[in-house]
């Protein structure tokens, strides 16, 4: 059987100086997405994708490892300045921001964009442990 010609596209290297880091910290996981100013994703990482499973995904250390992974991938695109937007009440909020700072980004602003309902949906029942 003849082998089909497969063209491999060379990855286009973007050169973007400043971006936005979206940190979504839920109770179960932490998702870090680094985008450009228009919202196009440059890199992303999660606690689960960093090798943590189960309840270890929701630890601050898992968020730190995920933020470092997303940060290093974004630095390859040339990002130097970051605006951080944090969403959610999870335990990985602060550690993700500290990790992005430690990777070498200059953080211009940190804002909390957690959605607050104007008495919308009924919240989940209280946990009984």
UniProtKB/Swiss-Prot annotation:
Pfam families: Ribosomal_S11. Belongs to the universal ribosomal protein uS11 family. Part of the 30S ribosomal subunit. Interacts with proteins S7 and S18. Binds to IF-3. PROSITE patterns: RIBOSOMAL_S11 (PS00054). The keyword Repeat does not apply. The gene is rpsK. One of its GO terms (cellular component) is ribonucleoprotein complex. Signal peptide: none annotated. GO terms for molecular function: rRNA binding; structural constituent of ribosome. InterPro entries: Ribosomal_uS11, Ribosomal_uS11_bac-type, Ribosomal_uS11_CS, Ribosomal_uS11_sf. GO terms for biological process: translation. Keywords: Ribonucleoprotein, Ribosomal protein, RNA-binding, rRNA-binding. This is Small ribosomal subunit protein uS11. Located on the platform of the 30S subunit, it bridges several disparate RNA helices of the 16S rRNA. Forms part of the Shine-Dalgarno cleft in the 70S ribosome.
């Amino acid at each position: 059987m003849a082998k089909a010609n497969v063209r491999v596209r060379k990855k286009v290297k973007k050169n973007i100086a400043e971006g936005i880091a979206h940190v979504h910290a839920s109770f179960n996981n932490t998702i870090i997405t680094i985008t450009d100013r228009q919202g196009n994703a440059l890199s992303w990482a999660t606690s689960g994708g960093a090798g943590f499973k189960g309840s270890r995904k929701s630890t601050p250390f898992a968020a730190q490892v995920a933020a470092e992974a997303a940060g290093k991938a974004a630095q390859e695109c040339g990002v130097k300045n970051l605006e951080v937007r944090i969403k959610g009440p999870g335990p990985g909020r602060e550690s993700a921001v500290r990790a992005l700072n430690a990777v070498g980004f200059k953080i211009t602003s940190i804002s909390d964009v957690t959605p607050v309902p104007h008495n919308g949906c009924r919240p989940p029942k209280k946990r009984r442990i």
